[in-house]
Every structure is written in C-alpha cells, then in structure tokens.
Design a protein with these regions (language model features):
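RNA/tRNA-interacting regions in translation and RNA-turnover enzymes
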Residues: 1-183
Length: 183
C-alpha cells in the first residue's frame, strides 16, 4: 500500500475539526485507510542518525505528521488536498466535485518526434490546468510530493510514465517531445 505523510494540524485545519488520535484512527478505519505512524521530521532524523547533536536536530520540524496507508487504487489520496477532500466528502461536509472540460480559446501544439520516442515511451499526453495557484508553499510541496508518489507507484519508478509539470506562463510555444541520447 502506498503511504502518504501529512501534517496533522494542517489536515485538521482542512477538516475543520481537531481530533484526538483515537478519534482520527476511528475515522481512518471507517473510511478505509490506516493510520500507520505518528511521527515528525525531527523524530525521523533522530531515529535515522543517533549521532546528531541537539543543535543539529534543531533544524528539523517537530510538527506532528501522520503516515497514512492508502489503497493502491486511490491515487487521489496521496496528497493533502485529495485526502482532506475525500474525508470531507465522507463526513458529509462537502459535495463530490464536478469538473468540466473547457475548450480553450487558443489551442497549443505539441510536436511529437515519434522516431525517437516510439521505443522508449510511445505515448504522450498533455493537459493545461488553468487557475492553479502555488502561492502557498504547502500546496506546491504537496503537488511535488504527489507527483513523486505517482512516479514511484503507478508510473513504476518512471519506467512506464514520466510526468513533467511546467508553468505555462513562463514558456513560449512551440513544444516538442523527443528522446535525447544520454550524456
């Protein structure tokens, strides 16, 4: 089972309630996930390197983190936003979202050089997500963590799929997908 590590207080903030650990474990059980570990970056660093001094340990965050095992088919739960949304829906605090595919006013073109990519990754899919903000560093870090979890799990350590994300506002079209020789 994949595991997602979430800041407890941030999760409770998104759920709109502070739970005791027992209450949260029960919520996890009822929802179908398992609270696997309660830790912190500080505790992990301390456990992994017994030789760290108190001064060296000061740089590690002591915020409580929950490591939650999620079912292998629930990739939406591998980030703070997905877990919080799913739990809020389960608790009846939020309705299931409805997403709409919108035709763009201007289409962008991706050129695929299939001669170089067919043997390595024969498929290429692109999407533009608008209205996404990464101003909150927690959201950006969660997004990067989700991308990494997907790479490690469903993408089979990038052997099947590699996900690239780019800020379209900082790029100029023409886009080309091709395979380059290793350096």
């Amino acid at each position: 089972m994949p595991t997602v590590t979430l800041d407890r207080d941030h999760l409770y903030e998104r759920l709109g309630k502070t739970y005791s650990q027992e209450e949260f474990e029960l919520l996890c059980f009822e929802f179908g996930v398992e609270l696997d570990d309660v830790t912190s970056a500080y505790q992990r660093a301390k456990d992994m390197n017994k030789n760290l001094t108190a001064k060296e340990l000061e740089k590690y965050d002591q915020s409580v983190e929950y490591a939650i095992d999620v079912p292998a088919n629930r990739y939406d739960l591998l980030c703070m936003e997905g877990m919080a949304r799913a739990l809020r829906i389960f608790l009846g605090l939020e309705k299931t979202p409805s997403f709409t595919l919108v035709e763009p006013t201007k289409r962008l073109k991706m050129t695929v050089e299939s001669d170089s990519t067919d043997a390595i990754r024969p498929f290429c899919v692109c999407a533009v997500l608008r209205g996404v903000s990464f101003e909150d560093p927690r959201v950006y870090n969660s997004f990067i963590d989700l991308q990494d979890k997907l790479h490690q799990n469903i993408c089979r350590r990038r052997t099947l799929v590699a996900i690239g994300t780019h800020d379209l506002d900082t790029l100029a079209p023409q886009f080309t997908y091709r395979a380059e020789p290793r350096d």
